[in-house]
A protein has these predicted regions:
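N-terminal catalytic scaffold of extracellular/periplasmic and nuclease hydrolases
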Residues: 38, 73-94, 104
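Residues immediately within or flanking Cys/His clusters that coordinate Zn2+
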Residues: 31, 35-36, 88, 92, ...
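Conserved, well-structured interaction surfaces
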Residues: 92, 97, 101-109, 118
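N-terminal module-boundary/linker segments of secreted carbohydrate-active enzymes
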Residues: 23-49
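Primarily the internal scaffold of c-type cytochrome electron-transfer domains
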Residues: 45-82, 112-421
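Positively charged n-region of N-terminal signal peptides that target proteins for export
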Residues: 1-4
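Bacterial N-terminal signal peptides
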Residues: 7-17
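Bacterial Sec-dependent signal peptides at the C-terminal "C-region" and cleavage site
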Residues: 15-25
């Protein structure tokens, strides 16, 4: 008798969304839903081995889930608008495409430009649509139209219109039966899951991770476009495509063994990828955690700390391999070669130009006393001996051989501009 009561109660709860929302089927639905409508079913995901692969918990501690809260992006956008006040509207529209995509896309549908500054500070003025950053229903609604072409870059992804009212397609990698389709469609207000292979393609990521920005001069004059962030094109010209290693292969690691993708009537699937979107920005994850009140961070402190630790581990194990070769001591002179192998499918570092990588080398004598160092980091984040850190108008030379502690072997992107009259 008790088993029958439990089954009856579960059935009533399961179909409650249908009873509540059934009359809305033919009404016009919003273009997007925020993540809170998704995580109700896509959290609480435990593999048979006991690993928690909850999609919502993983996502909300990522840079993707906090793209609109990112203080570096906020400051960069503000700086650009201050430098070019006459182009403020264009700056906000461009900078919101991939960092605040829901509000920007909805503005676009109304024939307006995207806004940024009206939502700052995010902890008080940010709407849920603005706070959600790169949300679930953004990526999972991008169609395969023009993917991989230049027309799709710089945030020019296409979101499919519903085939009928109340049937916005939400693309995923797995076939979904009619029962699960109905549950999702009724509980989200008209979003219907569909299997589509392009959701696992690098070309999907390329829509925002291939960025051409507008270079502006005096008075906001457009001088041309700048290939600012090119990780997808770098990947495309690497050996990774031939090895069938996509962006998702590294940045969304596959779960070992079977895993459920929903907590409601769960079905174990082979080949689920975790939504950790691990990259290189552990520093920003720590900032988001430390200043969570100011930035409106929703992920729990331990979740952010775990995500930052995962990023560090990812960098240390999968970004590069450093080995010492040809070690030679002659008299009081020590010579050695340092080999750095790029293990990524793109440049190292890549994407936004503020990133850099450098060699930190120390030599100690038999008593453990330091006798040489190059590339030491100062408390303020500057590198000892780096000419560019000491004077922004200078550049640290490219050294094939380091012979002094004030010489640094570093890698970063520099943009050199000149005025043509």
């Amino acid at each position: 008798m008790r088993r029958g009561l439990v089954a009856l109660t579960f059935t009533l709860l399961l179909w409650l969304p249908l009873l509540v929302r059934g009359g809305q089927k033919n009404e016009t639905q919003p273009a997007f839903q925020t993540s809170d409508r998704c995580v109700a079913c896509h959290n609480g995901l435990i593999t048979p081995s006991g690993k928690d692969v909850s999609i919502g918990i993983d996502w909300r501690s990522t840079i993707m889930g906090n793209s609109s809260r990112d203080p570096y992006w906020q400051a960069s956008s503000r700086r650009e608008a201050i430098d070019h006040p006459e182009s403020k509207d264009e700056v906000e529209d461009d900078c919101s495409i991939c960092h605040m995509p829901i509000t920007r896309y909805e503005a676009k549908l109304k024939g307006k430009k995207g806004e940024i500054f009206s939502f700052f500070p995010m902890n008080t003025n940010g709407t849920k649509q603005a706070q959600d950053g790169v949300s679930c229903s953004v990526c999972h609604q991008v169609s395969n139209e023009k993917l991989g072409t230049k027309e799709s870059f710089s945030g020019n992804f296409v979101v499919d219109a519903p085939k009928t009212k109340g049937e916005h397609p939400e693309y995923g990698p797995f076939q979904v039966d009619e029962g699960h389709q109905h549950i999702m469609q009724t509980s989200t207000g008209g979003f219907k899951p569909e299997a589509a292979s392009h959701i696992r393609s690098s070309e999907l990521c390329a829509t925002c991770h291939t960025l051409y920005t507008t270079a502006r001069g005096a008075g906001g004059k457009e001088l041309g476009v700048l290939p600012e962030q090119m990780p997808f094109l770098e990947w495309k010209h690497s050996d990774y495509p031939a090895k069938n290693q996509t962006c998702q292969s590294c940045h969304m690691p596959e779960v070992a063994g079977d895993a459920p993708i929903t907590a409601i009537l769960p079905v174990l699937r082979q080949g689920m990828h975790q939504h950790v979107f691990v990259g290189g920005n552990f520093f920003m994850q720590r900032v988001l955690n430390q200043y969570r009140g100011d930035l409106g961070t929703e992920a729990l402190p331990q979740e952010m700390a775990t995500a930052a630790e995962g990023t560090v581990n990812f960098l240390q194990s999968q970004a590069a391999r450093v080995t010492i070769q040809n070690l030679d001591v002659s008299g009081s002179t020590l010579r050695l070669d340092v080999k750095v192998e790029n293990l990524t499918g793109h440049k190292l570092p890549t994407a936004f130009p503020s990133r850099r990588a450098w060699l930190y080398v120390t030599v100690r004598d038999r008593d453990g006393r330091e006798v040489f160092q190059s590339g030491a980091l100062n408390p303020d984040g500057s590198i000892q001996g780096n000419d560019n850190d000491a004077d922004p108008t200078k550049f640290e030379p490219y050294y094939r051989e380091i012979t002094s502690g004030d010489q640094v072997r570093s890698l970063r992107t520099f943009w050199v501009t000149r005025t043509i009259t």
